[in-house]
Regions:
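Terminal RNA-binding accessory module
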Residues: 342-432
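Short, surface-exposed connector motifs at secondary-structure boundaries
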Residues: 2, 67-68, 220-227
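Conserved glycine-rich "GG(E/T)P / GGGxP" loop and the immediately following alpha-helix
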Residues: 47-52, 189-216, 220, 232-239, ...
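Contiguous mid-protein beta-loop-alpha structural module that forms a pocket-lining wall or clamp
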Residues: 307, 322-324
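Hydrophobic, well-ordered secondary-structure elements that form the walls
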Residues: 256, 299, 319, 327, ...
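Conserved strand-turn element in the central/C-terminal portion of the radical SAM core barrel
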Residues: 160-167, 225-234, 260-270, 291-311, ...
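Radical SAM/AdoMet-radical enzyme domain recognition
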Residues: 186, 211-212, 216-220, 225, ...
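Proteins enriched for Cys/Gly/acidic motifs involved in redox and nucleic-acid/cofactor modification
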Residues: 1-202, 239, 244, 250, ...
Length: 432
């Protein structure tokens, strides 16, 4: 039996798809690419935006059109957040949510064996439920491993449907995380990324903390780099920063979730910080890790309900002033079930798209300038994608993309380089 996966959304989704692929392989399935014909098509959905829902439906229709006899599966955040809507999608033979992922295998088998014509198995998340273990030790990149350590979110930001899609905070057992890190190190992975739905919430439900986990992860032999997923700035405290700076394996690249650079919009979004507080946290991280050593990335929403042209200009001024190395810009997507869905002053789609283009152009200028400022500096690069026998792409600790000629080296090696010119996509570099 052949199975293929189509994944939308965040690194957590990608991690879960990898774990599901491993589960199916261990039960006799062959995982194939989307271009190949399969007996089972699985869509791991994202519902952050309406566009994500549309893409999930489109891919299911395509799968049924190309292979009418195949079993199609819709799983993840979309059915969890909107179960009635997802259950009505005729092209999906199996519909499951963001929990109880192990049951997908059984549900698929029921349809394949003719025991059930269709299975809808969306279970609501409950307070007190435990983190669902989905072990994974094989990654497509073969160099960087993503390790899921937490699920769920207890916040209620006005624009966000994720708490509805993912349920409450559930932390993975620390021993389980460390065991997986040991397996990954034994398999040759040198860099791990700790991922989660709400990473700073790790341990808040189990009496530990993210910083403790980072410190213990750094003790795993063979793991040379630890990178963090998205962080909420208000959940980083002075002692956390001090302890993190003492962990030499921790990459000094921080994805600090911003969403808007306008205080009025942040209040409307129900984000629990101001731009001044955000800038203060960033300044403390720069001081702790070294201003020339640290980098920041973030997410920004434009076109939120009530955002005026002045608000947008204020947001753009703050965002460009922060000198982010990379910014993911999103036009606001109106999601049913969120507070902002009912807000007045919804902006027209064309205005949101225009602001998205303007913000993107501005942050790309900053990205190029920040990369150019690094020219001549020394950096360590993890070699990831071979373009030829000697040419590789990879990333510095600061997550700067690099192109380097490295004869005698292989994927997964960490090499010391001197950074050169920025070509619009990456820095060219030379081995020291």
């Amino acid at each position: 039996m052949r199975v293929t996966f189509y994944t939308l959304g965040c690194k957590v989704n990608q991690n879960e798809t990898g774990a599901l692929a491993q589960l199916f392989e261990e039960n006799g399935y062959t995982v194939v690419s989307n271009e190949e014909g399969a007996d089972v098509y699985i869509v791991n959905s994202c519902t952050v935006t309406n566009f994500g829902d549309q893409k999930s439906r489109k891919w299911l229709r395509r799968a049924k059109r190309e292979n009418p006899g195949a079993v199609t599966v819709l799983t993840g955040c979309y059915p969890q957040a909107f179960p009635d809507e997802a259950a009505e999608i005729a092209e999906a033979d199996v519909v499951t949510g963001s929990g109880n992922r192990h049951a997908i295998l059984t549900d698929v088998q029921k349809v394949l064996n003719g025991e059930e014509e269709r299975v809808v198995d969306i279970r609501p998340h409950e307070k007190g439920e435990r983190f669902e273990e989905l072990p994974m030790d094989k990654f497509a990149e073969h160099t960087r491993a993503f390790v899921k350590v937490e699920d769920g979110c207890n916040r209620r930001c006005a624009y966000c449907v994720i708490p509805r899609a993912r349920g409450p905070v559930r932390s993975r057992d620390e021993a389980s995380v460390l065991e997986e890190l040991c397996r990954l190190a034994d398999a040759g992975y040198k860099e791990v990324v700790l991922t989660a739905i709400s990473l700073p919430s790790y341990g808040t439900d189990s009496g530990t903390s993210l910083v403790e986990l980072i410190e213990k992860a750094a003790e795993v032999p063979g793991i040379e780099r630890i990178r963090l997923g998205s962080l909420d700035p208000d959940m980083l405290h002075d002692d956390d920063i001090r302890r993190m700076a003492a962990v030499k394996k921790l990459c000094p690249q921080f994805h600090l979730s911003l969403q808007s650079g306008c205080d009025k919009t942040l209040r409307a979004m129900r984000r629990p910080y101001t731009t001044a507080q955000y800038a203060d946290i960033a300044a403390k991280l720069r001081a702790a890790f070294g201003a020339d050593n640290v980098s920041f990335t973030t997410d920004v929403i434009v076109g939120f309900p009530g955002e005026t042209e002045d608000d947008f200009e204020a947001s753009m001024a703050f965002v460009t002033g922060m000198r982010f190395l990379k910014v993911h810009v999103f036009p606001y997507s109106r999601r049913e079930g969120t507070a902002a869905y009912d807000f007045a002053d919804q902006l027209p789609e064309h205005e949101k798209e225009t602001r998205s283009r303007r913000m993107t152009a501005a942050v790309e200028e900053v990205r190029a300038a920040e990369a150019a400022a690094m020219q001549g500096r020394k950096a360590s690069v993890l070699l990831e994608t071979p373009l030829s026998a000697t040419m590789f792409t990879g990333y510095t600790k600061q997550y700067l993309p690099v192109l380097v000629s490295a004869p005698g080296h292989k994927t997964g090696d960490i090499v010391e380089v001197t950074l050169g010119a920025w070509d619009g996509k990456r820095c060219r570099a030379e081995i020291v």
